[in-house]
């Protein structure tokens, strides 16, 4: 499927998305965090000016915080804090949807790595906490809100995953299973992950008949280098549009969630998201509906264990300078698992 010349030629059923390859920041004070927030607010305005038909602008993971992995309270955010309020107001002012990244204060443990989707009226439509922090590098609390989906612009259904989440095929499958036709993936990845980034963005799309829109931070903060690499993938796994390494570029594409929904209903061959739960429906009525996967049974029973479990070397963050944790996982009050 064509990209509509980067969304310049918008179809009646099209959703135009911009992926902002934001220059990598390095804030260490509340004032610096606020200055970076204002830069993102300015990029929301740029998105609207540069493409009047754009429906959604997506910012990468770490777009406010940078890659320092600092958990300092002065650079943590909250849903009702000034940074989030400024981002919401920017969406309302410019009548555009936005996807944003915050490092969220957590009084019960380490901060969460959280993502928000805000509509064009400034309302939060989706709130997600990263399920799979990039261990052993990242110190964030494992997410406890599940994988939500929300109604998006122009009849789309959106899901959001963050960076390392996308390396687990179960994440994208859950998004699709809950109805998402467009999955957003925000990241701070650096160049060594480039190949894995591309193939997982493609496989996540193809195996679930879902369009994916993914973007990393870009450029250098003097220590770390992020790669940009914005990428749109169609539901058949083909790349529709992609960016390079130019910081602050907004890469745009028109997606067609209506064609995703059509494929999910009408495809026979490689309708994998359906066939996964209806094995061999040519031979048996409705297909086999059982669960033959040992790891699924074990994970749900709390006994997930690999044959080589005792030999795994890295099982905490000590190799990256973090103290070994002493507490067990406990969902925060009010979470879906509490």
Curated annotation (Swiss-Prot):
Residues 15-257 form the CN hydrolase domain. InterPro entries: Aliph_Amidase/BUP, C-N_Hydrolase, C-N_Hydrolase_sf, Formamidase. Belongs to the carbon-nitrogen hydrolase superfamily. Aliphatic amidase family. It comes from Pseudomonas syringae pv. syringae (strain B728a). This is Formamidase. Signal peptide: none annotated. Pfam families: CN_hydrolase. The gene is amiF. Its EC number is 3.5.1.49.
């Amino acid at each position: 499927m064509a990209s509509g010349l980067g969304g310049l030629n918008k179809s009646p059923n099209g959703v135009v998305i911009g992926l902002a390859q934001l220059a990598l920041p390095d804030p260490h004070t509340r004032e610096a965090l606020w200055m970076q927030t204002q830069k993102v607010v300015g990029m929301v305005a740029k998105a609207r000016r540069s493409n009047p038909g754009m429906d959604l602008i997506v910012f990468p993971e770490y777009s406010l915080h940078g890659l320092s992995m600092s958990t300092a309270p002065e650079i943590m955010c909250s849903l009702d804090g000034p940074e989030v309020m400024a981002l919401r107001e920017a969406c309302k002012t410019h009548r555009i949807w936005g996807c944003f990244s915050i490092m969220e204060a957590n009084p019960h443990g380490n901060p969460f790595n959280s993502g928000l989707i805000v509509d064009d009226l400034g309302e939060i439509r989706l709130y997600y906490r990263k399920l799979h922090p990039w261990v052993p590098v990242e110190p964030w609390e494992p997410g406890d809100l599940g994988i939500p989906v929300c109604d998006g612009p122009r009849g789309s259904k959106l899901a959001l995953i963050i960076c390392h989440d996308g390396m687990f095929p179960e994440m994208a499958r859950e998004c699709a299973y809950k109805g998402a036709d467009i999955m957003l993936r925000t990241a701070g990845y650096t160049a060594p992950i480039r190949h894995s980034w591309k193939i997982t963005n493609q496989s996540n799309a193809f195996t679930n008949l879902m369009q994916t829109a993914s973007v990393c931070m870009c450029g250098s903060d003097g220590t770390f280098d992020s790669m940009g690499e914005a990428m749109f993938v169609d539901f058949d796994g083909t790349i529709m549009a992609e960016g390079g390494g130019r910081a602050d570029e907004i890469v745009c594409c028109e997606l067609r969630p209506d064609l995703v929904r059509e494929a999910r209903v009408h495809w026979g061959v490689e309708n994998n998201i359906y066939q996964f739960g209806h094995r061999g429906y040519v031979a048996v009525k409705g297909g086999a509906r059982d669960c033959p996967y040992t790891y699924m049974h074990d994970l749900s029973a709390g006994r997930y264990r690999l044959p080589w479990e005792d030999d795994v070397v890295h099982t905490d963050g000590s190799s990256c300078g973090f103290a070994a944790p002493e507490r067990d996982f406990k969902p925060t009050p009010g979470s879906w698992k509490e």
